[in-house]
Amino acid sequence: MKRILITIICIAAAALSVGAKNIKGTVKDTEGKGLAGVVVSDGLNVVQTDAKGRFVMDTDSESRFVFVSTPSGYKSAVLKGETLYYKRLGLSKTYDFVVEKKAKDDTNHNLIVIADPQISDADEFPELEVHAKDIGAFVKTLDGDDVFGLCLGDIVGWNHALYPEYNKVMSHTGIDFRNVMGNHDMTNYGDRHEGSMKDYENMYGPAWYSFNVGKVHYVVLNDNFFIGRDWYYIGYLDKRQLEWLANDLAYVPKGSTVIVSLHIPTTLSESDRKSFGYNDISEIMANKQGLYQLLQPYQSLILSGHMHTGNNQLIADNLMEHNVTGLCGAWWCGPVCCDGAPVGYKIYEIDGDKITW
């Protein structure tokens, strides 16, 4: 009997070891100096580097990436065209990162936001290029001030082979653009939600992550939940993301300014915050209250897209949502969106922890 019990225990331990994996690594600047207190995550677990820039983390079989929450004053370094803020988890047990110190202080910075470029055909790229060059011209007026961009999803319209050309056209902006995953960025006709992120992750890395600029903590989430049938989805944050967000925010001082970017809006009206309507299941987030609760200790702004209209909602005294108009408007059919708002981009000026637009 003892031998049987020992065998069972050994098998169970082996099974656990297959799922769990201990990894380590470093976060250094471009001169090779280790950076202390940098947050590193696998999309669930979150740790900080020690005084020498070293980290150790237990990860599991569901984790696909390890990434750095880029600290304020730094940007993700690029080596031979590879962005170094994330790495795909594999057989290696060591993952080293490099971040590059910015030339200027980023306490005051600018954020340019676009939503739903939704390029469905290569013939639409000239239209996108007009906007990209316009953004580039605006950036030049900032006279070297810190600025970066965010795309709130639906980068393309189902045809993910267009991603490389999209990236090329957006380079005309002259700035780094972080990306959010949209429902049109999903890999469809699979049987699991996790598989719906395949194409996006292959091009842009993790579908949820965080970074810091100045005094602001930025969070990117994926609330396009694939239900395992055709291309159908709902607005929903899965348990893993909510657990990760709680772990991530544990390193952010209470009262800080937090900007959350996602694709499907959490709310479009006061009424949808009071009661849930099944007809809206693909237009607003079903479990928004869980997100609101995590953001309660902070001064927060949520940025969303998806609707191709403009909408601002004051959710609480310390929480607002801006639903940003689509860059493609009514799918590149004219100069306005579905509600008549002009197509274009939104500009946010961040002065310390204060946001104006």
Which role does the model predict for each range below?
Residues 22, 70-164:
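N-terminal active-site segment of His-dependent metallophosphoesterases
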Residues 249-275:
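Short acidic, glycine-rich surface-loop motifs adjacent to enzyme active sites
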Residues 38-42, 65-66:
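Hydrophobic beta-strand segments
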Residues 21-36:
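Structural motif
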Residues 44-58:
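Short, acidic Ser/Thr/Gly-rich low-complexity loop/linker segments typical of extracellular
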Residues 33-35, 56-65:
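Short Pro-Gly-centered beta-turn/loop motif in secreted/extracellular proteins
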Residues 72-77, 85, 160-254, 277-301, ...:
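Extended active-site neighborhood of metal-dependent phosphoesterases/phosphodiesterases
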Residues 46, 61-78:
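A short, solvent-exposed beta-strand micro-motif common in secreted/extracellular proteins
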